[in-house]
Amino acid sequence: MKIVSTKTELEAVLAPWRAADDSIAFVPTMGNLHAGHLHLVDTAKTKARRVVVSIFVNPTQFGPDEDLAAYPRTPEQDIERLRAHQADLLYLPDAADVYPDDGQPATFVEVPGLSEQLCGKFRPGHFRGVATVVCKLLNRVRPDLALFGEKDFQQLTVIRKMVRDLDMAVTIMGVPTVREPSGLAMSSRNAYLSPEQKERASLIFRTLNQAAEAVRAGERDYARIEQEASATLEAGGFSVDYVSIRRQQDLAAPSADDSALVILAAAHLGRARLIDNVLISLDTTR
């Protein structure tokens, strides 16, 4: 596996691959790699001749009171794991390489509407930072395919819309969430949880599954389902930002004839802000 840290070095490795018409899959990450990230890499290996991974803790997607300084950074461990999973190239830039203007972007990419709701309501500017850095990384790597975990479903939806609206020549692939045996979605922020909190955190997935089952069984009072799920989480010790049932395609409020739904949640447990979702496919022919 090659490791580069600058845009110039990245281009020097990618140019011969492009000249040879090698297909390229890209997995952007913020590091502290866990089994969910590595599943993205393994999936990428089945989709393309070359797999590029980036590790960059992007400062522009963190708010002023968020965990940028505390976010877990494990570069040596990450490199070992990527080698074991046979990634071809690791791009490991610093802020000055990604944002040459004093480590901050002078130009931003924003996806209005999608970016201000759900997590965007509680993390103002977050998705502007995400869209900007992902746009820059996609322009630098120019992959055929970029892979993102479905755990961050709103992020995935924002990126898909950005790529579509800007006519970017890349396919965006969502990959199902990898979970702990308890059902807890794997996340770098799980490191903030104590063993007891980690056990309790699986309540999010169980609660979302129960809500999804109610929808599949025919319940259509979505507001009541959301309220009951929120109450369950609050009773379990969480501070809930939201539980919301939306249309998968664009995260709009669902109508009666929508069959592809998603129920999303964000809640705090101790120091950790946890997000999760469950996809719902309804049989509208019945």
From Swiss-Prot:
Pathway: Cofactor biosynthesis; (R)-pantothenate biosynthesis; (R)-pantothenate from (R)-pantoate and beta-alanine: step 1/1
Keyword Ligase: yes
Class of the enzyme per the UniProt entry, highest EC level: ligase
Pfam families referenced in this protein's UniProt entry, alphabetically: Pantoate_ligase
List of catalytic residues: 37 (proton donor)
Role this protein plays: Catalyzes the condensation of pantoate with beta-alanine in an ATP-dependent reaction via a pantoyl-adenylate intermediate.
Family: Belongs to the pantothenate synthetase family.
Protein name according to UniProt: Pantothenate synthetase
Organism lineage: Bacteria, Pseudomonadati, Pseudomonadota, Gammaproteobacteria, Methylococcales
Gene behind this protein: panC
